[in-house]
């Protein structure tokens, strides 16, 4: 049976001493075109898994869905043709065709100017989370994410994201697209009524501005990554009151924004 998430390819592996012909695993790409109320809305190139969650999470992050049961009349996916059909209980906003357009807007009414999609100022949430955690909990959660990253270990070609409490990881999702992995998590939360304000977001890739915005739209207050952030992402995190920590590996980490949610040791070295 064909694995929809990865494929086997014959490759030539070269080192400084050897040339080896062998088989290797590579991640598959799957295009999915989303229709909303019979109108073509977006095409996403993704990993063919958890597609319903991804569609719902994407529409939620675009501001079209707030409550799954109230806002979605029907959802069906034709995986053989690569189409998703969503019927909403309300009409599309008149400005829906501009949702994918880049524009410059201010964050939550502040004067600082940052790059946002058309509707980001309305859908990005300023975090009011009171969740706190220790560095040791951060290390354990990131180790758990790594252990769950089976497809990445086999292919090296996907991103992993997870939702957790400070004590344990709750759910993880995988995709070739970093945004898609986050949309899958958000979709799961919307479809299952999972509260997110007290949760922690774990991520395998860098924290870019668009990734940070996804976290804000999901509604978490803490985002942990094994990789680096960008300067614009940190500016947004400060404005949205989101704690960001990166380079979490080998018992080390960097805290970039809103550090009071990470309970650091009292002894500090200047």
UniProtKB/Swiss-Prot annotation:
From the Swiss-Prot or TrEMBL record, state where the protein is found: Cytoplasm
Q: Which GO terms describe its biological process?
A: Mo-molybdopterin cofactor biosynthetic process
Which GO molecular function terms does the record list? sulfur carrier activity; sulfurtransferase activity
Keywords, in A-Z order:
Cytoplasm, Molybdenum cofactor biosynthesis
Q: Which Pfam families does UniProt cross-reference here?
A: FdhD-NarQ
Q: Which domain of life is it from?
A: Bacteria
Q: Where does Mo-bis(molybdopterin guanine dinucleotide) bind?
A: 247-252
Active site (UniProt) = 108 (cysteine persulfide intermediate)
Q: Name one GO cellular component term.
A: cytoplasm
Family (UniProt): Belongs to the FdhD family.
Q: Which NCBIfam families does this one have?
A: fdhD_narQ
Name the HAMAP family on file.
Answer: FdhD
Record's function text = Required for formate dehydrogenase (FDH) activity. Acts as a sulfur carrier protein that transfers sulfur from IscS to the molybdenum cofactor prior to its insertion into FDH.
Q: What's the name of the protein?
A: Sulfur carrier protein FdhD
Gene that this polypeptide is encoded by: fdhD
